[in-house]
Amino acid sequence: LHMIHLHWYQYPPMNPMMYPLLLIFMLFTGILCLAGNFVTIWVFMNTKSLRTPANLLVVNLAMSDFLMMFTMFPPMMVTCYYHTWTLGPTFCQVYAFLGNLCGCASIWTMVFITFDRYNVIVKGVAGEPLSTKKASLWILTIWVLSTTWCIAPFFGWNHYVPEGNLTGCGTDYLSEDILSRSYLYVYSTWVYFLPLAITIYCYVFIIKAVAAHEKGMRDQAKKMGIKSLRNEEAQKTSAECRLAKIAMTTVALWFIAWTPCLLINWVGMFARSYLSPVYTIWGYVFAKANAVYNPIVYAIS
């Protein structure tokens, strides 16, 4: 109780019907996520032709999504059953840390996948090809930096506290001290604004490169008096473009899922009167549900 902010005491208990609905939703998304990401990892690791440097990033994305739901899913089921957090203050902090860690690793893995597409499509032969060593270094960097940022609340830079609905835990966005808010400013920049800026930058040039390539192919085909050019280079470029579209779709779905979390943090800091327990719980539930999207999108590819 000492970890719960006074802001939440002004609200009555949530409608009891919310908990069964939330439990069913989490059961559905949890099973889909764990099964989908497990299959993704298994297929990529056991199919020799798929064990490429670029696909190491895909496997890392599936692993971070799997770990997120594996650690978030069971506690959420328990808290929904009991209508309150029953797992103690220590596990509350661990729960929030793991959620932040996996979310951060997921978005930065998507950023590196996007950057790899940018390198292949925009730079072409001038770009340095992704090697297994380089991909492994990227993955190590993702997890080290994500752990560094997410472990900070354990040392006093912000705190991990229960949400107002008492079914989950997260960062403290209601404290008004400069230290707590500075963490949210930096963390929002690190996990949302900077990745979004990099992603937009890469895709602007990817789209330009694809458009220029398609125009060049049409002009060349017109000069030759045929409908299209069906050579190996065109097929390869077309495959790369399809992969870029898949990556772009996945990134868009990720940002759609995690934007509510950003809004919750900033509304909590600057307009807390609009923040209710129901709003916070569904914001974070849909954020966790993004772990379901990625294996579906990559399975289609």
UniProtKB/Swiss-Prot annotation:
**Keyword rRNA-binding tagged:** no
Tell me where the transmembrane regions lie: 19-43, 56-78, 93-115, 135-155, 183-204, 246-267, 279-300
Q: Which GO terms describe its cellular component?
A: cell projection; plasma membrane
Q: What is the name of the protein in this document?
A: Rhodopsin
Q: Indicate which residues are glycosylated according to the record.
A: N165
Q: Which UniProt keywords apply?
A: Cell membrane, Cell projection, Chromophore, Disulfide bond, G-protein coupled receptor, Glycoprotein, Membrane, Phosphoprotein, Photoreceptor protein, Receptor, Retinal protein, Sensory transduction, Transducer, Transmembrane, Transmembrane helix, Vision
Where this protein primarily resides, as one coarse class? membrane
Disulfide-bond pairs as recorded: C92-C169
- Membrane topology, as annotated: Multi-pass membrane protein
Entry's CDD domains? 7tmA_photoreceptors_insect
Q: Ranges in the Extracellular compartment?
A: 1-18, 79-92, 156-182, 268-278
Q: What does this protein do?
A: Photoreceptor required for image-forming vision at low light intensity. Can use both retinal and 3-dehydroretinal as visual pigment. Light-induced isomerization of 11-cis to all-trans retinal triggers a conformational change that activates signaling via G-proteins. Signaling via GNAQ probably mediates the activation of phospholipase C.
Top-level taxon of origin:
Eukaryota
Per the UniProt topology annotation, the Cytoplasmic ranges are 44-55, 116-134, 205-245
The record's comment on protein family reads: Belongs to the G-protein coupled receptor 1 family. Opsin subfamily.
Q: Where in the cell is it found?
A: Cell projection, Rhabdomere membrane
**Position of sequence motif 'Ionic lock' involved in activated form stabilization:** 116-118
Please state the span of the N-terminal signal peptide per the UniProt entry.
none
